[in-house]
Amino acid sequence: MRKKRIEERPSVQQLEKELSRIKYKSRYRTVLKSTVYTLITVAAVAVLVATLWLPVLQIYGSSMTPTLQDGQIVFSVKTSEFAPGDVVAFYYNNKILIKRVIAGPADWVNMDADGTVYVNSEKLEEPYVNELAYGETNIEFPYQVPDGRIFVMGDHRATSVDSRNTAVGCVSQEQLVGKVIFRIWPLEEMGFLNR
């Protein structure tokens, strides 16, 4: 005769424990999926905001010293409204340059040999410039800004290549990335940029 194997039935406590383990595993997976989807959504929104509305830019070079230093990181805001004194970012030869708006369309810009700037025959007050300089200039002053363009200059006039040079020239609306408004790095200098 064959021996019949008798299987032991699990107790109620064992069944409840196994059911609890399975439910926990299911809840864990649900929470994990939800967290991953949330992180992906937040990352996608952050990328869209950073590229479409608030581009984040790193400063390279010394053309905007003392306002902006090499290695600093700033936010810019996409806008079509720019006024003299605003710091703007724009595309130039597959790079992004950052300069200060000096004059708008149809304005007359003049500069004397010492580096003092005049817009529409009025001396431009520039507290953001430490040292005036004529800099690298190959345009003829007085210069009238063409329609639909803005005249920009770096704050460190001796080293900046800007609208004073035909290589860069005046900046068109299509070239503009946005207005630089906020410094985020280094942390001890975090804050809004002054005009």
Give the positions of each predicted feature.
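Short gly/ser/thr-rich secondary-structure transition/capping motifs
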Residues: 132-136
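Extracellular/periplasmic catalytic domains that process cell-envelope and extracellular macromolecules
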Residues: 81, 110-111, 143-146
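Protein maturation boundaries and topogenic segments
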Residues: 1-96, 171-175, 179-195
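Beta-strand-rich cores of mature extracytoplasmic or soluble domains
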Residues: 139, 143-195
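RNA pseudouridine synthases
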Residues: 99-110, 114
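Structural motif
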Residues: 71-72, 86, 107, 149, ...
